[in-house]
A protein has these predicted regions:
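Sec-exported extracytoplasmic/periplasmic mature domains
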Residues: 138-146, 197, 241, 259, ...
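Extracytoplasmic
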Residues: 76-79, 86, 93-97, 175, ...
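Soluble non-cytosolic domains of exported or imported proteins
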Residues: 78, 124-131, 182-186, 244-248, ...
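Periplasmic/cell-envelope proteins involved in peptidoglycan metabolism and beta-lactam response
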Residues: 1-390, 412, 487-494, 611-613, ...
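Beta-lactam-recognizing serine transpeptidase/beta-lactamase-like catalytic domain environment
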Residues: 6, 92, 98, 270-284, ...
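Ligand-recognition elements built from short beta-strands and adjacent flexible loops
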Residues: 575, 614, 628, 658-825
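Acidic/histidine-enriched alpha-helical segments
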Residues: 149-165, 317-330, 440-444, 507-510, ...
């Protein structure tokens, strides 16, 4: 506090000493002031930090989030590319389908509502109305075209199941989205839309309040992958998953090529998330997927699959079979079959092959892990110590895995005597032997502590290489392998491509190789390897190696895709021949071709059952023991019967390979009897279709005497016909009957028929079937021949020009196989 004071010069105030309380108040004020300033600074710092965090650190993120709240980003699905065979036939395509869904919560006609005291709403279903709507929707869903409602069988299980699905879905009154059906075609979708529109219009004006209201049913566009031929080349084509992504086969290996690139449409949206009608939209167009054009030919594939299926059934093949037709010069695959397989339209369904698969899994339980285990994970055994199978296991995963596998590239096997072609090529190319090099076969041959025998323990005596290959002498090839030596043997084995993948453009080619390196090839290993019983390979590896032995020595990369095109058919990429290396010389290859032709020998050699009259065919059979599998009940090893053929033998164009894994033919295990006829059958149809060069001999006008085939097994019957230049057609109700003997044939035994006539064989009847004769007058001879062949008839053409007369009246009924004489002029 201040008080005034006086002095002589100035008038002023004198400071009075402050009290203690005053000094405390002053310090508090100063502290508060400082704290206030500090608080302002801290607050400012927080604000600045927050702004920095929002605008700088997370600025892009928040701006994107804000944009997302204002913009609607819609995906435009790219259409998946198609897959065509070599001639342009569609093997896989994509179609637009629809998912039909409903919003029961907004379908006021289906329920009555009551507001409760607590403001909640209780909805009560109207069963009669729900049943009426469900019935109408189900009829349209099952009609196929949305119009043929009367054709739907309402008593069928299919109808009852679909009806219940729709009814149950519509009954979920608090749900805003329920699926009624998927993969619905456009006609059905339009029919449902028409019904819903008409229904809502009628019930909007209803005077009866119980009939007033609406139903909310909508559709969503989606895509469906279609495979028009079903279980055809399934292991090659593969399939896509529910999202349209390739998961197996070509669909997987060419996923990025087929899929294309999705597009986008970006536009403003309103408060409820819908697009604003007048707002500007930015569209990034989708880029549809490219198409695959295969080297695979549907006709060649069908022939290979048909004869492979017959052989599997006829010989009770336990572990599936496979077949390959390949261009030996380019590696282009014309057919690749693994049977039994699956339908890529429904790959999860294995019921058609369930009995076969069940027997297979139980025959080799360790391969599929189906033994019972105790609480500690140990296998449970019976009193004899045998592992007990889990009969209640869910084998579905195993079953699908078996059927989905492409046997030609995923499974290893011992090639057996087919590999003798490779050993022979090694000997000739290395210079340690020639075709005239001889070794003696005494029926037994000792190597270290092992004793080797030939099939049937035969003693072949003194043989040159060609005779040894023809008689499939194990002992000759063991001695040849010894002369080649371990290091050189391995070098050739590697050069022929057996130590690496083939590089085929398919997924899942096994990376597991089972072979001996040079330093591991002891005396016994080398001996066993020389005739194909020590190193395991894939069927496709065997094919590419055989191709190299006959095409001049070049190892080519096999391929299934020939070219890639855009949606307009323009070629984007061509897949040409890829020669990896030359393995043997041209001269060595020529010798191999000669010896392989000697093996088939115009129907007289060891591979005679693959001979087809009119063609120069080389080949080699192989019957191998599967040393890595369980033995049969009789104690013998399970067998693999295989045969490889090349033609024309003097300058091969194609290779035909057949393999039957664990055939159970009570008569024989020999591949020359089991597999060679299958190759011959395939050749009999494929060679003329592809225009393969014949042996040059003109057989037109040649008359052939039909052999007596009644009582002969189908496999033997077709061999006889192929050798004589007669075609064959099996007429039966069940393909499994092909194991039975022929019960009837037409034309009959002893008939004189033109070369190339088709003989119709039956295994389930003692009389032939009949067919109606078409009218071919006025047609060209070639077209008339096609018409008669399609009707199951043979023909003889006399004269030239168009057909003027035919020996059987048009419309008449004759026995299938009858020869119709056509008079031309």
């Amino acid at each position: 506090m201040q008080e005034p004071f006086r002095n002589k010069k100035n008038r002023g105030y004198r400071l009075r000493p402050a009290s203690g309380r005053d000094r405390l108040d002053s310090r508090v004020r100063r502290l508060c002031s400082r704290l206030g300033i500090l608080a302002v600074v801290v607050a400012a710092a927080i604000v600045i930090r927050s702004l920095y965090n929002i605008q700088i650190i997370h600025g892009a993120e928040y701006r994107q989030y804000a944009a997302q709240q204002q913009l609607l980003d819609t995906t435009i699905k790219a259409t998946r590319g198609e897959i065509y065979d070599a001639s342009g036939i569609t093997l896989a395509s994509t179609s637009v389908v629809w998912t039909i869904w409903a919003d029961p919560s907004y379908s006021s006609i289906l329920y009555t509502s009551k507001t409760n005291d607590d403001d909640t709403v209780t909805k009560t279903l109207d069963p009669a109305m729900c049943a009426e709507v469900s019935r109408e929707l189900t009829l349209r869903l099952l009609s196929g075209d949305g119009e043929s409602l009367d054709s739907v069988d309402t008593s069928s299980a299919e109808y009852q199941q679909q009806y219940q699905t729709v009814y149950d879905a519509l009954s979920r009154l608090d749900s805003a989205y329920v699926t009624l059906a998927t993969k619905v075609n456009n006609a059905v979708k339009l029919s449902i839309e028409k019904y819903v529109t008409s229904f809502n219009k009628a019930h909007k004006k209803a005077t009866d309040t119980s009939r007033k209201g609406r139903i909310s049913v909508s559709s969503e566009k989606s895509f469906q992958r279609n495979y028009p031929y079903g279980a055809f080349a399934a292991a090659v084509l593969g399939f896509t998953d529910a999202d349209g992504v390739g998961t197996y086969g070509l669909e997987k290996s060419y996923q990025s090529t087929l899929a294309g690139v999705d597009g986008r449409t970006i536009t403003q949206r309103n408060a409820v998330g819908n697009a604003i009608a007048d707002a500007n939209a930015t569209t990034f167009a989708a880029k549809d997927g490219s198409n695959l054009v295969l080297s695979l030919d549907v006709n060649v594939q069908e022939i290979a699959e048909r004869y492979l299926n017959e052989a599997i059934a006829a010989n009770t093949v336990e572990n599936r079979g496979c077949a390959i037709v390949m261009n030996v010069k380019t590696g282009a695959i014309l057919a690749m079959a693994s049977k039994p397989d699956f339908d890529p339209n429904d790959p999860l369904n294995y019921t058609a092959n369930e009995a076969y698969l069940n027997e297979l899994v139980h025959a080799e339980p360790e391969l599929y892990g189906v033994y019972k285990k105790d609480a500690d994970g140990n296998y449970i055994t019976d009193e004899q110590g045998n592992k007990i199978l889990d009969e209640e296991a869910d084998y579905s995963g195993y079953y699908r895995d078996i059927l989905w596998k492409n046997k030609t590239i995923t499974e290893l096997y011992y090639p057996g005597s087919v590999f003798k072609v490779i050993t022979s090529a090694m000997g000739i190319d290395s210079g340690v032997a020639t075709m005239n090099t001889t070794f003696t076969c005494s029926g037994a041959y000792g190597v270290a502590k092992e004793t080797y025998h030939c099939a049937g323990r035969k003693a072949h005596g003194l043989l040159n290489m060609a005779e040894a290959l023809r008689k499939s002498c194990n002992i000759y090839h063991i001695q040849l392998g010894q002369r080649v030596g371990s290091q050189q043997f391995y070098n050739y084995f590697d050069a022929f491509g057996f130590t690496a993948r083939t590089g085929v453009d398919l997924p899942s080619e096994t990376n597991f190789m089972q072979y001996y390196r040079a330093d591991q090839l002891g005396e016994v290993q080398l001996a066993s390897s020389s005739f194909g019983q020590a190193m395991a390979i894939t069927p496709l590896q065997m094919c590419t190696a055989i191709a190299a032995t006959v095409n001049g020595g070049y190892l080519v990369t096999p391929h299934v895709v020939d070219k890639i095109t855009d949606a307009n058919g323009n070629v984007i990429q061509e897949i040409g021949a890829n020669v990896r290396r030359q393995v043997i010389s041209q001269s060595a290859s020529e010798v191999i071709r000669q010896m392989m032709e000697y093996e088939v020998g115009n129907g007289t050699g060891g591979g005679k059952n693959a001979y087809v009259s009119g063609y120069r065919i080389g080949g080699k059979s192989g019957t191998s023991e599967q040393l890595n599998m369980h033995r049969r009940a009789d104690g013998d090893y399970k067998k693999v019967a295989s045969f490889v053929a090349v033609l024309p033998a003097n300058d091969p164009e194609i290779l035909v390979y057949v393999m039957l894994d664990d055939p159970n033919n009570a008569r024989t295990d020999y591949s020359s009897i089991l597999a060679a006829p299958v190759a011959g059958n395939i050749i009999s149809e494929v060679a003329p279709y592809l225009g393969i060069a014949t042996d040059g001999e003109d057989r037109s006008g040649t008359i052939v005497t039909v052999p007596n085939l009644v009582g002969t097994e189908w496999s033997n019957a077709q061999v006889q016909l192929n050798i004589q230049g007669l075609k064959h057609q099996l007429q039966e109700s069940q393909s499994s009957q092909s194991a039975a003997p022929v019960t009837y044939q037409y034309p009959h035994a002893g008939s004189k028929v033109p070369y190339g006539t088709t003989i119709y064989l039956y295994t389930d009847t003692y009389e032939g079937s009949r067919t109606e004769v078409p009218d071919v007058t006025g047609k060209s001879p070639d077209f008339a021949r096609q018409m008669l062949s399609a009707a199951g008839l043979n023909c003889v053409v006399e004269g030239s020009g168009t057909v003027q007369a035919q020996s059987a009246e048009p419309g008449s009924s004759v026995q299938r196989g009858t020869i119709i004489t056509l008079t031309c002029g």
